[in-house]
């Protein structure tokens, strides 16, 4: 009875009143104090007076500004970035940006422009990036650009422009990007291209224009960083038209909704009279490939043949011996040996990702690629009972291997012995079966990144990660520890150089306070989406300055003794936890408000208890934890009763003692 009465009095003693201060007013979000503001989609028809004059970056898209003039932004003289996407702008009057001398980037995307004054852009002296995408213009002459000598990129996609000819006096000396994708350009003349002569290493995007003709000599001696003719059906026109040009990257891919046309070897003859380092031919149809199909590709460094319906490459291909990077993704190979790897002795990067048929790795199919550094075989339905030394024979210089999203792989001891130089190994979403007690990774002394997420790996073995002295990043997301606990002795203890540890979605319920003691270099720990309570925070007491993600756990009350551990971290995420917002958690709530700069996703860090404050942001809660009147009353009653009982007890004791003298 006595304990029950005591509890009752203690509850009454600490009855508290709670209140939440919230604001429902829509206003711009401050991203950087006095400098960067987001006012998107607020239905505004003018610049809010609350924005300081010191504003430098303003995101103002999805508002309503039918007309802008010289008074619209006049006081924001420090603007360097202005986004006016979909603001229903029709008219841009004289000297609209006359006060914005420092304006660097102007975005006018998706505004139905009718009029733009000749002096509309006369103010900015350092304008570098202009976006006129989907504005309905039919000619570049619509934009007054004659004074923009600092312009580096101009985006004009999704309009009705039929010629790329730039206006007379258009400054191109510093122009690096000119984007005309999805317009109505079908012919390129010498006159068109002559207006680009002053631009060096330009990236010209004509994707989605279906070029039907190029005047002979239009690209003579031209030098481009990149050219994009994506969606053009007649590749013969392109290769003939680019004669005598020099191009770093040439993009000639097509789209899925276009009719497949066979590419004959004659199409590529024009390549013999131009210089190209990288070509993308994705989604074209190669019906028959002979040994001479690529004979004009002799200087090529990179070739992308994604989704080109290939099921086999013949041996003895001419012209690809110097190729460094080859992409054969989304094709129809059944066995890795069908790519005839001996055709590419200089290859350093190979990607066969998302093969449309189950890919058999075979034995030694890539052994001629002794210079290979990166290999991507993800999403290929690969399955093998003995991975991976026979399959990766002679790849001693391989540094990156991606086998993610495949079928079950069985790993023996030193499963990657043929690849001792590996620095990155990705086995995510591939079920792994470790056959031996010893680690399958133990010879990978240079491995820095290991992704084992959702691999259904048995993590109970303490030797699982032996032999990985250089490992810095380990992702174990979606794997389960025995009984949902990480014990003092565990498989992670040998990873002394680990910096990033991901243990999200691991169904963890507890972590021993000494589980991570040997992991002294960690700076990023993700424990989100588990069943952890605040007691597991003790396991991080030896770490300082880390990013700590505790989102979506079962943390309710954080005791005062744990607050110093949180205080010494760089960034903390506590969103979607059932946080207690009563006086029982008052010390944490006070700490939370004092350390907002450390906290991430504060908009989703909400109270769960008491019901009155459920769904309220912690930052908006103010508790008054002083003793309530009813508490004082019960305290007085309790003290009076206690005093009376004490008096009677003393009196009884003295009487008993007197009687027994």
UniProtKB/Swiss-Prot annotation:
A Pfam cross-reference name: LRR_8
Localisation per UniProt entry: Cell membrane
Gene3D superfamilies xref list: Ribonuclease Inhibitor
LRRCT domain location: 577-627
Gene Ontology CC: mitotic spindle; nucleolus; nucleoplasm; plasma membrane
Tissue-specific expression: B-lymphocytes and spleen. Not detected in thymus, kidney, muscle, heart, brain or liver.
Protein name: CD180 antigen
């Amino acid at each position: 009875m006595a304990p029950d009465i005591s509890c009752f009095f203690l509850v009454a003693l600490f009855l508290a009143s709670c209140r939440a201060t919230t604001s429902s007013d829509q206003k711009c979000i401050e991203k950087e104090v006095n400098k960067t503001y987001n006012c998107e989609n607020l239905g505004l028809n003018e610049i809010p007076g609350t924005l300081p004059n010191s504003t430098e970056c303003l995101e103002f898209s999805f508002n309503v500004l039918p007309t802008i003039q010289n008074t619209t932004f006049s006081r924001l003289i420090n603007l360097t970035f202005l986004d006016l996407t979909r603001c229903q702008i029709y008219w841009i009057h004289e000297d609209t940006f006359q006060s914005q001398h420092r304006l660097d980037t102007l975005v006018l995307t998706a505004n139905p422009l009718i009029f733009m004054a000749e002096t509309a852009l006369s103010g900015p002296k350092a304008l570098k990036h202009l976006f006129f995408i989907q504005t309905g213009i039919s000619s570049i002459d619509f934009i007054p650009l004659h004074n923009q000598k600092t312009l580096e990129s101009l985006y004009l996609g999704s309009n009705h422009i039929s010629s790329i000819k730039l206006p007379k006096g258009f400054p191109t000396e510093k122009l690096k990007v000119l984007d005309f994708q999805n317009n109505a350009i079908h012919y390129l003349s010498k006159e068109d291209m002559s207006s680009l002569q002053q631009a060096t290493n330009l990236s010209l995007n004509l994707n989605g224009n279906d070029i039907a003709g190029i005047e002979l000599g239009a690209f003579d001696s031209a030098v481009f960083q990149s050219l994009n003719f994506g969606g053009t059906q007649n590749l013969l026109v392109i290769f003939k038209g680019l004669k005598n040009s020099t191009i770093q990257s040439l993009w000639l891919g097509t789209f899925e909704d276009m009719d497949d046309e066979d590419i004959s070897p004659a199409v590529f003859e024009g390549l013999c009279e131009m210089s190209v380092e990288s070509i993308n031919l994705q989604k074209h149809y190669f019906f028959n490939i002979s040994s001479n199909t690529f004979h004009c590709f002799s200087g090529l460094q990179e070739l992308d043949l994604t989704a080109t319906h290939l099921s086999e490459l013949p041996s003895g291909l001419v012209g690809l011996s110097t190729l460094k990077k080859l992409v054969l993704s989304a094709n129809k190979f059944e066995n890795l040996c069908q790519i005839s790897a001996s055709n590419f002795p200089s290859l350093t990067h190979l990607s066969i990702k998302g093969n449309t048929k189950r890919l058999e790795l075979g034995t030694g199919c890539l052994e001629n690629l002794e210079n290979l550094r990166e290999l991507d075989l993800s999403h290929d339905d690969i399955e093998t009972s003995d991975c991976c030394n026979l399959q990766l024979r002679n790849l001693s210089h391989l540094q990156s291997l991606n086998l993610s999203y495949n079928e079950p792989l069985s790993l023996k001891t030193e499963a990657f012995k043929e690849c001792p130089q590996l620095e990155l190994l990705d086995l995510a979403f591939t079920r792994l079966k470790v056959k031996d007690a010893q680690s399958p990774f133990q010879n990978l002394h240079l491995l820095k990144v290991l992704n084992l997420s959702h691999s259904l790996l048995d993590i109970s073995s303490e030797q699982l990660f032996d032999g990985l002295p250089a490992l810095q990043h380990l992702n174990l997301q979606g794997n389960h520890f025995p009984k949902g606990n990480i014990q003092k002795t565990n498989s992670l203890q040998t990873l002394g150089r680990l910096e990033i540890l991901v243990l999200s979605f691991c169904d963890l319920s507890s972590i021993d306070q000494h589980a991570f003691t040997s992991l002294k270099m960690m700076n990023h720990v993700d424990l989100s989406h588990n069943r952890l309570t605040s007691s597991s925070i003790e396991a991080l007491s030896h770490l300082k300055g880390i990013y700590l993600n505790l989102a979506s756990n079962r943390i309710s009350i954080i005791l005062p003794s744990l607050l110093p551990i949180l205080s010494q971290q760089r960034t903390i995420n506590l969103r979607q936890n059932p946080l207690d917002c009563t006086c029982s958690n008052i010390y944490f709530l006070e700490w939370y408000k004092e350390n907002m700069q450390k906290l991430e996703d504060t908009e989703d860090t909400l109270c769960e208890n008491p019901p009155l404050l459920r769904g309220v942001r912690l930052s908006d809660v103010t508790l008054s934890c002083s003793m309530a009147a009813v508490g004082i009353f019960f305290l007085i009653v309790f003290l009076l009763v206690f005093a009376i009982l004490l008096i009677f007890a003393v009196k009884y004791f003295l009487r008993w003692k007197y009687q027994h003298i």
